[in-house]
């Protein structure tokens, strides 16, 4: 019998007998465990051989045998829990222990660095699973980061300085205002073993032509081996950066025929997905990666939803603290939480409603009514970026007849719930009921349901001149809520003729967007880890991090 199953049977037997020595029979014990008399004898003999109990069998009618426990069920449960942790079986651990608080403490004690069979393993605790990792779909902040570890693209944007770097393409050039040429590396392999071919690249870039930022791509062809030409309908100075974004990551052309591709995608990046369940995401270093092989062999993201109830539910990779080893990496996000007024509803489009609501739900009001732990993580926002002060809040008069408003945000985001509760209380003081809708991220991203206002958070990556417009333009919700000529805006941006500060100020001037809070991103980690540089998404590049060996 497998060790895990035997441990479960012992724990169950110990619980049924209250851990007490007793005189009993095989039949009575078999009834307790719902098994046959013969199987019960086998179980007792095996448990006795393990040193967990003694079984003094008596033969004869009416005679009772003595069962003595040498091991407690709690001790064995702890041992079983340790085994499950080492095997990364978090789902079974939750079932075994039951108490989420106890599971959390066990997980935290095993976070950080582990060295097993010559392999460096990093364990990370996170507050939600990541079911969808498919480029070109609606991806949240963490999914965006993980996709960058799994996939490669023609170019790569350096997370620390925003500079453009080679990836699948080793060089590129602008042949004419409407034609760019990229030169690709040969010999690149997908995680499932097949070699990358030009058809994979063409198919990947063709499939995203429906996205607003890629809609100006008119034709993609390969004039010679490992040479890719991209034809445009309008000039785009940002195209090389655009082709380094997650939607433009390269997929194998047969991806739609591969089972569960969204949760178990196959790319050419430094890490390959080994497991992705509601309790765990495990990625392994890809030995055949065409770049520098990752120094951390395995990254395990353990999922425990209950940690999201804490305000500082950022990335946690803090193991046992030894000699003041603990370190906290933090940065003020390049972005903010903001309110988005929906011009498709009468209340959302009404200028007086926008003015009054933005006054009542001002950043200072939200901060004042937040709990102290959150006040330490929040900073009032008066622009989309921390250094901008574009918002001009006014006093505003409450519009006559305003009795209710609808607010919508996406699920699995504790701070959204906290902000919504504060907003509800503030509006209730003025006899306005806030109807709150929590929906899936896909629904939120599409923005096709009715809502007066929407709650969102934006994290802009480097370079900001690129990502600020690119991020806002690629979310259908914003284009649905804000009536303006987005195509004309995109043409100006591509031509390098857009003043982004002025453009953002226009969005804030009519209260289409109302900044609320800048948030401190936090990584709780260990000083033994080197190369950890928090990016603007609140994560770090796994392949560049490494562990310093212990002192001799």
Swiss-Prot record:
Residues 26-49 bind DNA. GO terms for biological process: negative regulation of DNA-templated transcription; peptide transport; positive regulation of DNA-templated transcription. It comes from the Bacteria. Residues 163-493 are annotated as: Solute-binding. Keywords: Activator, DNA-binding, Repressor, Transcription, Transcription regulation. Coiled coil: none annotated. Residues 1-116 form the HTH marR-type domain. Transmembrane segments: none annotated. One of its GO terms (molecular function) is DNA binding. InterPro entries: SBP_5, SBP_5_dom, SgrR_HTH_N, Tscrpt_reg_SgrR, WH_DNA-bd_sf. Pfam families: SBP_bac_5, SgrR_N. NCBIfam families: PRK13626.1. Activates the small RNA gene sgrS under glucose-phosphate stress conditions as well as yfdZ. Represses its own transcription under both stress and non-stress conditions. Might act as a sensor of the intracellular accumulation of phosphoglucose by binding these molecules in its C-terminal solute-binding domain. This is HTH-type transcriptional regulator SgrR. It comes from Salmonella choleraesuis (strain SC-B67).
